[in-house]
UniProtKB/Swiss-Prot annotation:
One of its GO terms (molecular function) is ATP binding. One of its GO terms (biological process) is 'de novo' CTP biosynthetic process. Signal peptide: none annotated. This is Uridylate kinase. The lineage of its organism: Bacteria, Pseudomonadati, Bacteroidota, Bacteroidia, Bacteroidales. NCBIfam families: pyrH_bact. It is found in: Cytoplasm. Its main location: cytoplasm.
Amino acid sequence: MAQYKRILLKLSGESLMGGKQYGIDEVRLNEYAAQIKEIAEMGVQIGIVIGGGNIFRGLSGASKGFDRVKGDQMGMLATVINSLALSSALVAQGVNAKVLTAIRMEPIGEFYNKWRAIELLEQGNVVIMSGGTGNPFFTTDTGSSLRGIEIEADVMLKGTRVDGIYTADPEKDPTATKFSDITYDEIYTRGLKVMDLTATTMCKENNLPIIVFDMDTNGNLKKVMSGENIGTLVHN
C-alpha cells in the first residue's frame, strides 16, 4: 500500500545525462520511467517537474554574458525537452502521461493550470509540468515547490544522486553523516543546501514535506512510496 496518495516528484536535468557529459541518456531515462510506472501501478497520483541543466542552465549562461532573462527562458525550454522525453518513455512503457507547459506552446503540451493538472491526475495520468514557473529568476526547485503546493501533493520527493541530506557534502567530506529526518528550521540554521531558499521557504510555509532520496538506484522510488526509511524527510 502506498504511503502517499498524491506526490510531486522533482528530478534534476543532470540526472538524465546518466554517464554522458550532455543531453539525455536513454538507459537512465527508461530506468526512471520504469520506476515511475511501478508507483503508478500502486495507484499513486504522480506530478513531475524536471530541471533542464543537462541541456542549458540560465544562471551559468548569465555568467558567460547571456542576458539573464533570455538565459532563463532557454532553461525553461530545456525543461520542456526533458519533459517530452520522459513522457515519451512512459507512454512506451504503457503509462498514460501528459505534458503541461508554464508558457503557451500548444500542440507541444497543454497550457498549465492547477485545475487541469488535478483533473488529469485524478484520471490516472502522470502529469509532467514543464517550463518552470514560466518566469525568469526562479529555479526549477522553486517551480517544483510551487507545483507541489498547487496540486495539493502530500509530499515532494526530490530524486537525486545522493541518498539523503548530510551534515556536509559526502562527496567531499568522508566524515559527513546522514540525517534520517530534519526540520526546515534546522536546515536554515545549519546552512544546508537542499534546495534554494525560495523553494525551501515555500515548502515550509505551506507545510509540504520533502523526502530527499537516491533516484539512481532502481527500486528506490517504490521503497519510498511503500514507507521504507530511505533518504531524508524534511518537515516542520
